[in-house]
Amino acid sequence: MAKSQDVRPVIKLRSTGGTGYTYVTRKNRRNDPDRMVVRKYDPVLRRHVDFREER
């Protein structure tokens, strides 16, 4: 069974472009304790935008 406070939890990255598009990834909680912001491609907008971690 998975621990409730896993070191590498699964997180959702939601587009800031307002399209609602999400990426699902894992992050290391020890190295990145704050919310992640990653610049990735949004296929709905057909451009790169910031994706923010959603909890």
UniProtKB/Swiss-Prot annotation:
Domain of life of the native organism: Bacteria
Gene3D superfamilies found in the cross-reference section: Ribosomal protein L33 (2.20.28.120)
Any one Gene Ontology cellular component term annotated for this protein: cytosolic large ribosomal subunit
UniProt record, GO biological process: translation
Keyword Ribonucleoprotein: yes
GO molecular function, one term: structural constituent of ribosome
Keyword Ribosomal protein: yes
InterPro entries assigned: Ribosomal_bL33, Ribosomal_bL33_CS, Ribosomal_bL33_sf, Ribosomal_zn-bd
Entry keywords, A to Z: Ribonucleoprotein, Ribosomal protein
Family (UniProt): Belongs to the bacterial ribosomal protein bL33 family.
NCBIfam families xrefs: PRK00595.1 (NF001860), rpmG_bact (TIGR01023)
Listed name of the protein: Large ribosomal subunit protein bL33B
Provenance organism: Kineococcus radiotolerans (strain ATCC BAA-149 / DSM 14245 / SRS30216)
